Regions:
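N-terminal acidic leader/helix
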Residues: 1-29
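Short, charge-rich amphipathic interface segments used for partner binding and complex assembly
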Residues: 29-62
């Protein structure tokens, strides 16, 4: 038996990661390495959104 998955909590945490990544981007200013790495981080967060947050939204509507 697999443990229950709390998609709402995961969705909240993903949104929090997105917010923090934006803060890092603002704090990093024009440092090229920060700009590149935040861009990569946001792409990874987007994949999490596709995999988790979108499913969470579907589950809420059913």
């Amino acid at each position: 038996m697999s443990p229950e998955v709390n998609t709402e909590k995961m969705d909240h945490l993903i949104q929090e990661m997105k917010r923090i990544a934006r803060e890092v981007e603002l704090a990093g200013g024009e440092i090229p390495a920060v700009v590149r790495n935040v861009k990569r981080l946001m792409a990874s967060i987007k994949m999490l959104e596709i995999n988790v947050s979108d499913v969470s939204g579907i589950l809420k509507t059913t």
